[in-house]
Amino acid sequence: MNKKCDELGLKNTHFENTSGLYNDNQYTTPIEMAIIMRAAMDNPVCAKVLSTYQYDSTPTDKHTEGIKLTSTMFSRMYGNEVEGVSIQAGKTGYVYESGHCLVNYAEKDGKHYVCVLAQGTNKWHCIFDSFDIYTNYLP
């Protein structure tokens, strides 16, 4: 990821692990997270992962029916879509040090938008704050 960040020209982002768990040397800014999301949506594999509501993993010896993985963003927004806006992809996050976070990718009238929210005090605030932004600030 750090190599990709260099390719994208990001100067205020650095990754130390792939889990997203807190590390003093792992950081980004909202603007750079938006750039990362835009780049991820240009990658067909990343776009598919970020836009999938639910996925059943391959069965294993320990999980003979596979494991059902559900997007926390899509499950939280279910039934509360923003009129005229299609939220197509996103990723939630939470660590104590950063609070609840969200990056999502939306489309309205053929134009694409990225919304980044951080330091939320509750898992629902980021979702509904992004709805408010899309409702009140998109042309």
Regions found by a protein language model. Name each.
Residues 1-139:
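Penicillin-recognizing serine hydrolase domain
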